[in-house]
């Protein structure tokens, strides 16, 4: 399926679940980007998850997002439980605008959710010749050494910087040995995962 055709189909699905066309388009772009860069655990495999969260009212399809400008360099966004892609899109755009004006841009977002690849947003800033750092929290998924129960989030971190060439440096990772997206893909495709990256009831 061609990328444009796929995007149209994803937009239709999101609109069916109540997203505006603009928010559906932003979300579709992020999902397709994940597929194109090979991060399948953050691509189309997540589409059902987002739709389910809308149905369960975890995600607000019609959010009233509020942006508060703290200073010339800092903004705070209350995303009103919007789909994460929309909140992240607003956040990186605001950070870029601040940085271009004052040399640094900082944006904090609350009341949002899973937004896919941090690298997708870092790349947008790097294309504007900006160094970027993105941090987010996550629910418990990582067990401390010797434990069987999750305590820490994967808490993804992302760094991006121009390199002077067409290929920027972008590191999008988490504090866990493997991201949950890869575990999800392996489970769905009945594939084995490397030893030592996950725990069951026996350790």
Regions found by a protein language model. Give the residues of each.
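Histone-fold modules and their flanking histone-like tails across chromatin and transcription assemblies
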Residues: 1-6, 59-62, 196-203
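N-terminal amphipathic, basic helical "cap/leader" segment at the start of enzyme domains
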Residues: 22, 36-47
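Short, well-structured alpha-helical segments
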Residues: 21-32
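Active-site cofactor/substrate anionic-group-binding motifs, chiefly glycine-
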Residues: 43-96
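A generic, well-ordered mixed alpha/beta core segment in the N-terminal half of proteins
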Residues: 75-164
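Generic N-terminal amphipathic, Lys/Arg-enriched alpha-helix
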Residues: 1-17
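Phosphate/diphosphate-binding glycine-rich loops and adjacent basic-rich segments that engage nucleotide
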Residues: 142-203
């Amino acid at each position: 399926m061609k990328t444009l055709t796929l995007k149209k189909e994803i937009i239709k699905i999101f609109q069916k679940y109540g997203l505006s066309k603009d928010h559906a388009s932003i979300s579709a772009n992020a999902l397709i980007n994940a597929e194109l860069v090979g991060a399948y655990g953050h691509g189309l495999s997540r589409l059902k998850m987002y739709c389910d969260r809308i149905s369960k009212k975890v995600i607000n399809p019609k959010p009233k997002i509020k942006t508060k400008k703290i200073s010339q360099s800092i903004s705070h966004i209350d995303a009103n439980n919007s789909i994460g892609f929309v909140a992240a899109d607003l956040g990186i755009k605001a950070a870029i605008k601040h940085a271009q004006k004052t040399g640094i841009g900082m944006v904090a977002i609350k009341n949002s959710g899973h937004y896919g690849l941090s690298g997708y947003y870092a790349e947008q800033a790097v294309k504007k010749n900006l160094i970027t750092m993105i941090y987010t929290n996550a629910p418990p998924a990582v067990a401390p050494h010797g434990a069987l129960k999750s305590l820490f989030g994967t808490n993804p971190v992302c760094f991006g910087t121009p390199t002077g060439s067409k290929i920027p440096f972008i590191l999008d990772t988490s504090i866990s040995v493997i991201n949950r997206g890869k575990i999800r893909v392996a489970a769905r495709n009945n594939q084995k995962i490397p030893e030592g990256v996950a725990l069951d009831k026996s350790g």
